[in-house]
Design a protein with these regions (language model features):
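Bacterial Sec-dependent N-terminal signal peptides
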Residues: 1-20
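Beta-rich carbohydrate-recognition and catalytic domains
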Residues: 17-44, 53-121, 130-186, 200-257, ...
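Beta-rich catalytic cores
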Residues: 45-47, 122-125, 191-193, 258-260, ...
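Hydrophobic core register within WD40 beta-propeller blades
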Residues: 51, 128, 195-197, 262-264, ...
Length: 367
């Protein structure tokens, strides 16, 4: 995520624009939120930006590739790159603060906080959810692979982390790692779950994607299980286009065009489920679709926002757009995304890049 296969990048230009019948108002920068997550020392930027609210006073943020060091004169100094980190956001008296956490090697050097128990590969955190007092979090297992510069990695599986004490400091978490069996990784096709989670009545809906070799577009997939039973993999069911099947091979795409990271949540102001993601492959456009059901059918896409960072340089791209429901309101959604550069040097030399960045989108109330 800090670096990506740039020879495949397709940047799509355009101005922000909404259809006249769109339920959304024009997106605006949420600088008041973005500024909370910036720091000039220690933790100095990350992507990923998945969050889980564990109480009214605390939200956990899970980051993928993370920079540590200092920021001076708009540059990152003494930079160290690790594979993941955790932010703890606490709310008090209408204000919020964020403390960042990462791991250490036996030599005392900075390292990722979440590490595979067998020591092979690394984790990028994806969607998580509270189940009673326990937090469950999907971790995409990654490994090094042959490939062009910036693309020397591959998916190696998905692990479910069960954290028994998420209210404690992250470095003291008790974490159980469970291999997710509902994964298919082949030379021509891969299927992964954990991109998004949505709880509706008695079910937890777990979203993922199918990706075919050579394809630019990922296809949205959906599984479900009983509420608070994500780790009971034998009970998972997969949407097959008209109903639910226990067989992963029966899963049918809900739509084509999602990113690996996206969000699905019910929005009271819309009285519908909302899907938000970055359009196409590394497009600067964040788009939305709506549905009356968690499985669709989904509406035509509506462009919510074109990330301004792509205008700074041809070396800059944006991705990872998703709703943060814990920061959103009935008639306002808060969306986060990441802005990156095509080289590590580009990120090091421009400290405007590679922070959790937020926008707010007002919703026109539905009668």
């Amino acid at each position: 995520m800090a670096t990506i296969c740039f020879w495949m990048i397709m940047m799509i230009s355009g101005q922000d624009g909404l259809k006249t019948n769109s339920p959304f108002a024009r997106a605006e920068p949420a600088k008041d939120i973005s500024d909370v997550f910036k720091s000039s020392k220690g933790w100095i930027g990350a992507d990923g930006n998945y969050s889980v609210k564990i109480s009214d006073e605390k939200t956990l943020w899970f980051y993928s590739d993370t920079w540590l060091g200092d920021v001076e004169n708009n540059k990152r100094k003494n930079p160290v790159l690790i594979n993941n980190s955790v932010g703890v956001q606490e709310f008090k008296d209408g204000q919020s603060t964020v403390q960042y956490h990462w791991g250490k090697t036996v030599e005392g050097k900075p390292s990722a906080l979440l590490v595979p128990k067998d020591g092979n590969g690394w984790f990028w955190p994806f969607a998580g959810i509270m189940q009673g007092e326990k937090l469950v979090l999907f971790l995409f297992l990654m490994e090094k692979a042959d490939g062009p510069s910036g693309f020397a990695f591959k998916n190696a599986g998905v692990v479910l982390a069960e954290i028994d004490n998420p209210n404690d400091a992250p470095n003291f978490w008790h974490i159980k790692q469970i291999k997710v069996p509902h994964v298919s990784i082949g030379e021509q096709r891969k299927v992964l779950f954990g991109s998004a989670i949505c709880v509706v009545k008695d079910f937890t809906y777990i979203y993922g994607y199918e990706e075919n070799k050579g394809g630019f577009y990922k296809k949205m997939l959906l599984a479900r299980c009983s509420k608070n039973q994500v780790a009971k993999f034998a009970d998972w069911e997969f949407y097959d286009g008209s109903g639910w099947s226990k067989n992963l091979e029966d899963a049918k795409p809900l739509m084509e065009g999602v990113a690996s990271e996206y969000s699905v949540n019910y929005v009271p102001g819309l009285k519908k489920f909302l899907l938000v993601y970055h359009d196409a492959f590394l497009s600067p456009d964040i788009v939305a679709r709506t549905s009356l059901n968690p499985w669709g059918p989904w509406s035509e896409k509506i462009k919510l926002h074109t990330c301004e960072e792509k205008r700074w340089s041809n070396e800059v791209f944006c991705y990872s757009g998703k709703v943060q429901p814990w920061l959103s309101k009935e008639n306002e959604i808060i969306i986060s995304y990441a802005a990156n550069a095509k080289s590590l040097a580009g990120v090091i030399n421009d400290a405007r890049l590679y922070w959790p960045t937020f926008i707010r989108v007002k919703i026109n109330p539905v009668p």
